[in-house]
Amino acid sequence: MLYFPIKGAKPIYKKENPMTRIETTFATLKSQNKKALIPYVMAGDPNPSNFVGLLHDLVKHGADMIEVGLPFSDPMADGPVVALAGERALAAGTSTRDALKMVAEFRQKDTQTPIILMGYLNPVEIIGYDNFVGLCEQSGVDGILMVDLPPAEAGSFTRHLTEHSMNEIFLLSPTTLPDRREQVLTHCGGYIYYVSLKGVTGSATLDTNDVATQVQAIKAETDLPVCVGFGIRDATSAKAIGAHADGIIVGSALVQNFADIDANDTAAVANAQQKIMAKMDELRTALDSLSA
């Protein structure tokens, strides 16, 4: 299949493989007039033994696909909530390879829900592009977003991903310069991740009118789905953004429930996960009300 992210543009790399799970999921959602709910969680948080179960619970409570953060010691784009989640995961001994093993375990029971890895380039470079992408394919990863890899410098990495039928996802923000914006729209696959706020994850102020304007402008330039993250915390913001975007990405509002708990306290972990699932139910209901 050939895929043309930019309207009327030619693909940089010829893609003859079937649709990815991400592409298939968005096609299904579009046919059902539904919006994608994409939770973000940090691999190994609150502890490695609970993480795979957390992924399955997210699906049961309405996740259409899941972004899994790769723990890193210097997460420049992460706000305090997500950064602390990474610290907890690292303290528990979770490495990039461990994260991939968790995805592989998830895949033993779930072969449908797309998994997108979100992280930073340094751990990937240590493993090596080819080895990393091979491990991702073996584990059942569907897409990768490297926060600090500009599209103009992603050629080799992009080729590896394309050869293995995985989507490479990039960020667009209110401050993205025109040249960078064009590069993102040219190279991106799966979906556009639009950062709704100026700042790091978990920032507080969300201007839904501005987001709506920006999303509409992006949609005029690409056929890719546009999903919005940063600042979505509740049903009100989910519904306001979901009315214009193809999906919403929610991280800090979920991950914050693992803050300040004892990761070895089974009851505390279970209680935190119940709060996360209650939030998922709230967000799912809000999005589904848009197509009711």
Predicted regions: what they are:
Residues 20-24, 28, 74-82, 94-103, ...:
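Active-site-adjacent beta->alpha loops and helix N-cap segments on the catalytic face
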Residues 66-73, 143-145, 150, 194-202, ...:
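Glycine-rich phosphate-binding active-site loops on the catalytic face of alpha/beta enzymes
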Residues 45-48, 66-96, 196-203, 258-259:
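Glycine-rich, proline-tolerant flexible connector loops at the mouths of alpha/beta enzymes
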Residues 81-116, 159-169, 173, 211-226, ...:
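Alpha-helix-loop-beta-strand connector modules within alpha/beta enzyme cores
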Residues 19, 214-222, 233-239, 243-292:
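Alpha/beta catalytic cores of nucleotide-metabolism and tRNA/nucleoside-modifying enzymes
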Residues 49-56, 176-185, 232-248:
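Catalytic cores of alpha/beta
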Residues 17-38, 103-108, 291:
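N-terminal amphipathic alpha-helix/helix-capping segment at the start of soluble metabolic enzymes
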